[in-house]
Amino acid sequence: MKAERESLESYEEEFTLCNKLGLHLRAANKVVRVASRFSSDVWLSRENLEVDAKSIMGLTLLAAAYGTRIKVRAKGVDARAAVEALGALIQSKFEEED
């Protein structure tokens, strides 16, 4: 029963995009690479639109510019780690120079 409970772990946090270009293609590619390291299902959402964080096409649909609040949500055994890793990427401005 414990393993089943762990597989259903869900975690979410909100972050603000603080890089000048927002969630552009290069940044979206980095999100996909980080999210794909985890077995959990991972989503990013903006307002009423939620997309798979492992899909670059989905991420481009968010059209998230500088200052946009993004919710990162994950469900699975490593949900918290996935959200924290993506949060660190977002807070690092996608490791890009301003």
Residue ranges and their predicted role:
Residues 2-6, 33, 61, 81-85, ...:
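Long, contiguous binding/interaction regions
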Residues 65-98:
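C-terminal structural segments of small proteins and small subunits
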Residues 7-14, 69-71:
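Intrinsic-disorder/low-complexity, polar/charged segments enriched in Ser/Thr/Lys/Arg/Asp/Glu/Gln
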Residues 1-4, 25, 45, 72, ...:
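Short, intrinsically disordered low-complexity segments
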Residues 16-66, 74:
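Compact, glycine-rich, soluble single-domain proteins
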Residues 2, 10-12, 18-21:
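Positively charged, low-complexity intrinsically disordered leader regions
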